[in-house]
Amino acid sequence: GCPQGSISGPYMWNLCMNGLLDRLSAMNERIVAYADDLMIVANGNSRMEMERMADECMRIVYEWGREVGVSISEKKTVCIMLKGKLNVDGRRMRVAVAEGTISSIGYVKSARYLGVCMGERMSFADDIRGLITKVMGAIGGLRRVMRKEWGVKKKTAYTWAKGLLLAGVMYGSSVWYEGMKYKTMRESMNSIQRCAMYACLRVCRTVSTEAMQVLLGWLPCDLECVKDKCVQGSAWHRNDESDLVTDAEIAEKRARSCKLMKEREHEIWQRRWCESTKGRVMHEWLCDVNFACERMWFEPSLRVGYILTGHGTLNAWLYDRDPLDSAACPCGAPRED
């Protein structure tokens, strides 16, 4: 692999790796290389044809390894079916390591490459599930200073959540953002966001995710993914007609396209908030999704948060369980419910 801890090591490795890439390019297969991580995408109309092409490519890799004096990690070398419905459970692909020496590479249902977990047929569900575990662990560590009655201010908590957590969650989103068109993927991403939002807000656990997003002023996570892809696409002029902003619009003026992108994402968010059946009590108070976004000073207390989300002051609930002497509402009603 690439020499570690050396100043000139990466540059020398690039020169060395170029020889392998030149040989593989003659195979007319797609090659992806980053440092010493190599991915070969073999195409074919049948499993036999794909395995034959992969075998020829791996033969070149093993020959190159012997020439430059590096070994191939067989434990990390796997095969995965990215397209099609071929059954490869328990199957292993035979590859020629050297003249007269045969090895095999096993098929897996998911593989991690450059920090992104890809599943069969380009599914990123395993990657999302891994993000949920990471976020829950990070939020658990921050809860010691993020309490309902005391702790850091909303602005600080919001900065932590977006700066530390959002950056990790959005990693690789330009690759798997298309998965947001599926309801299950959107719900998984929003559940990740919900964990962070609940730690930042002084509200009950039963408050809907849509209401938390508006109360905190945090764009829904699935829209954040599309936005992140559009930002990267605008830099490389790789957006298409299905994205929020196309290349033709970006060409006019970058500043205008950024403004247009923000307007469109908020239009989608506003439409969702108005059409949703959840958080209707808070919708009467905060019908504009931009309210909290544009007013960072807006930091409702625990009692105000209960009122905005429809939980009220809980006087009747507490009275029925004896902590309070009266079930009356502060507004004058004999019973607060």
Curated annotation (Swiss-Prot):
Residues 253-337 are annotated as: Nucleic acid-binding endonuclease. Keywords: Endonuclease, Hydrolase, Nuclease, Nucleotidyltransferase, RNA-directed DNA polymerase, Transferase, Transposable element. Its EC number is 2.7.7.49. SUPFAM superfamilies: DNA/RNA polymerases (SSF56672). The keyword Transferase applies. It comes from the Eukaryota. GO terms for molecular function: endonuclease activity; RNA-directed DNA polymerase activity. It catalyses: DNA(n) + a 2'-deoxyribonucleoside 5'-triphosphate = DNA(n+1) + diphosphate. Residues 1-118 form the Reverse transcriptase domain. This is Retrovirus-related Pol polyprotein from type-1 retrotransposable element R1. It comes from Nasonia vitripennis.
